[in-house]
Each structure stands twice: as C-alpha cells, then as structure tokens.
C-alpha cells in the first residue's frame, strides 16, 4: 500500500470514528469458563434514537420474511428450525443479537463507512436479505458456526434501506456456537468476507482485518506488572500496579475499544463457568458503558428522557451451554435473566416480546437492618 493510500485510509478511519461516537459504538466479547461454558456478551450503544429493545421469544416453526426488495419483489422467506430468544429492535423482528436452542449466538454491530453489500439481482430476490434480516436468518437456520459458513454461500445480502436510518444498515456480525467456534462476517467492497480466526472481541469500523493488524502494536500488554530494573545502581520500579498495561488506549473510538476489550478478556480472571463466567463478562463490559454525551441532544424530550442515562441502551450476556440470557438496561443496572431451557415454547402460537426497560425490578435492594 503506497503512502497516499495509507493517508486516505487513516483519514477514513478518523472520520468514521467520529460518526460512530454519535451513533453506534458497540463492544462484543467472549469468555470461556473452566467447565467449557462459552459466554457471548455485548453492549448496545446507540445515541441517535431509542431502539426500543425487547426480549423476544420465538418458537420453532415461526415464519419469517425479509424486507421488500428495491423493485418491490418479496425477499427471502424462511421458517425457524429452532427456538430463539434475543433482543429485537424498533418494534420489528429485527434481531440485534440472540441465541437459538442449539446454543448458537449472533451479534450485530455497526460498521459505518466500510460496509458495502452485494448488488441486488432481481432474479435472485428469493435468496436476498436486507442487512438487518441476517441475524434472524442465521438464528432460525443454523445450529453451528460450521453450518453458518456453508449457509452464507447460498444467500445474498443486498443494500435494502432501513427507514429509521435512511440507508442500508452498515453492520457486521459475530457468530459463536456453544463449542466456542466463532466467525466474524463482513460485507466490504460488495463481497462476503468471513474471518475464521478471531480474537474473541469485536467493535466497529474499520473492518476486522485492520483491528487484527492494529493489535500487533500492543503485544506488550500483560496482567502482571513489569519488574523493576537497575539503572546505574538505581532501582527503577513501576509506580504502582498496572505497569503491564501502560499504553492501553482509554478513549471510546472503535480501535481503542477493540484493544481494551482484547486486553481485558486476555487478562480476565479464570472462571468456573455458568454465572461465574457471566459475572466476569458483565464486569468487563462495564468499562465500555457510554455517558450521556454520546446521545444526540436534538432528540425529542420523550426520547431524551429514555436515553438520559447514556448511549448504552442495554448490555446482554448469553450463556450458550446453559441457554440463559442475562441483561441490564440503561435505566436499571440490576441484572435480570431469562432461562430458555425452562421456557415453554410449545405454548406459543406466535412470538412474544417483552420490553426490556421498566420491568418490575428495583433499582436497588434495601438492606437496612431492622432496629
């Protein structure tokens, strides 16, 4: 790559980072417990408007259809093979993330400035999806990451405009199964790209290969403090704990959050599995919660009231072995959970949605002792 291309790329990265800071700035991580429990977790940052997140329960056999194609034709249609629990957005069956009954997780994150989808071909409308349809399609169709790799070859993701955004949603995806197998899916320059080797974390722009290369600048990161050194008879010791992470970027741009997420997951405490691993995941993601400054101040008063606690609309953690979902919302940091294995999907004739905010849970538990 010549110097002019490098400069152009860096300028694009800078501009996209500014764009992401005012809208989507999500962070995704994975941790594995000693018992093999794989936990996939993410924050959902969106300061442009209220996403109205709902915990959604979908029984197998539910019919789905993609958004209408540019020429008015129907897009892909499918029937879910598996039960699904996940977060749908904007009052529609658009999954920001979720897990199916086989322990497969999908998480959608923003990729502005770089996502470019396959060209729409009218004769292939029946296998075409909008970007926001992809998560639901994967959750309904596949049990493992290996199946997803093959299945992606048989669909096309085309630039269908999401009305709330005014453009085709610029996104990429992390897909993880209960064995720990994981891929990152991106559509860049009109072509499908699948990354089979991942670092277990994902943020936003630029594309994934850039983040992997950028990680080479931080190979010195470690959990332990650097030892003292003798310089001309003077003992030069670290100034307190944390010297192993000197140089760790602290801002909220996607490249910096990626490195920070990588550092925190690689230096995380060893967990036993189950809720212990979920607990560590949520603790790590608390480092990525965005403040009120990330919210668009031009929102109407009602939406500003909803988002007054900051741009992180929710945090969710999926235990892929035990099929449990744990979440927090911007209005209430208490952790709530859903046990997919005990929920009676057979009793459903259609999907049900439960608003994640304002559930009957207290902000704090009163532990004042009786006098």
Show where each model-derived region lies.
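Structural recognition of the beta-strand scaffold that forms the well-ordered cores
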Residues: 39-41, 105-108, 174-176, 184, ...
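C-terminus-biased signal that marks the final domain/tail of proteins
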Residues: 24-39, 47, 52-53, 66, ...
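Compact, glycine/acidic-enriched structural inserts
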Residues: 58-72, 113-156, 349-356
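Bacterial N-terminal signal peptides
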Residues: 9-19
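Bacterial N-terminal signal peptides that target proteins for export
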Residues: 1-10
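Aromatic- and glycine-enriched pocket-lining scaffold segments that form the walls
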Residues: 145, 149-187
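A short, structured loop/turn motif at beta-sheet edges
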Residues: 100-102, 139-147, 271-278, 320-322
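A contiguous strand-loop segment
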Residues: 25-126, 159, 366
């Amino acid at each position: 790559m010549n110097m002019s291309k490098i400069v152009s790329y860096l300028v694009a990265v800078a501009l996209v980072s500014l764009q992401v800071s005012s809208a989507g700035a999500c962070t995704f991580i994975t941790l594995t417990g000693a018992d093999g429990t794989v936990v996939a977790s993410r924050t959902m940052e969106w300061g442009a408007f209220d996403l109205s997140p709902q915990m959604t329960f979908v029984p197998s056999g539910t019919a789905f259809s993609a958004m209408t194609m540019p020429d008015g034709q129907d897009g892909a249609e499918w029937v879910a093979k598996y039960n699904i629990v996940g977060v749908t957005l904007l009052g529609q069956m658009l999954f920001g993330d979720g897990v199916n009954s086989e322990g497969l997780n999908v998480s959608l994150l923003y990729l502005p400035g770089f996502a470019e989808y396959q060209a729409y071909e009218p004769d292939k409308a029946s296998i075409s999806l909008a970007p926001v349809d992809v998560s639901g399609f994967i959750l309904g169709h596949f049990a493992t990451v290996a199946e997803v790799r093959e299945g992606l070859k048989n669909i096309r993701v085309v630039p269908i405009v999401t009305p709330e955004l005014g453009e085709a949603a610029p996104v990429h995806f992390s897909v993880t199964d209960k064995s720990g197998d994981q891929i990152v899916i991106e559509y860049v320059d009109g072509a499908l790209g699948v990354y089979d080797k991942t670092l277990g974390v994902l943020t936003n722009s630029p594309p994934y290969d850039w983040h992997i290369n950028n990680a080479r600048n931080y190979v010195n990161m470690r959990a332990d403090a650097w030892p003292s050194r003798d310089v001309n008879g003077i003992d030069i010791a670290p100034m307190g704990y944390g010297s192993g992470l000197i140089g760790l970027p602290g801002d909220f741009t996607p490249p910096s959050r990626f490195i920070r997420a990588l550092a925190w997951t690689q230096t995380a405490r060893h967990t036993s599995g189950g809720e212990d691993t979920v607990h560590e995941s949520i603790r790590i993601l608390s480092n990525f919660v965005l403040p009120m400054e990330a919210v668009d101040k031009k929102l109407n008063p009602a939406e500003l009231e909803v988002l007054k606690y900051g741009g992180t609309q929710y945090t969710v953690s999926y235990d892929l072995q035990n099929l449990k979902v744990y979440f927090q919302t911007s209005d209430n940091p208490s952790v709530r959970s859903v046990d997919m294995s005990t929920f009676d999907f057979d009793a459903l004739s259609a999907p049900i949605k439960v608003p994640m905010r304002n559930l009957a849970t207290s902000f704090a538990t009163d532990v004042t002792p009786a006098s």
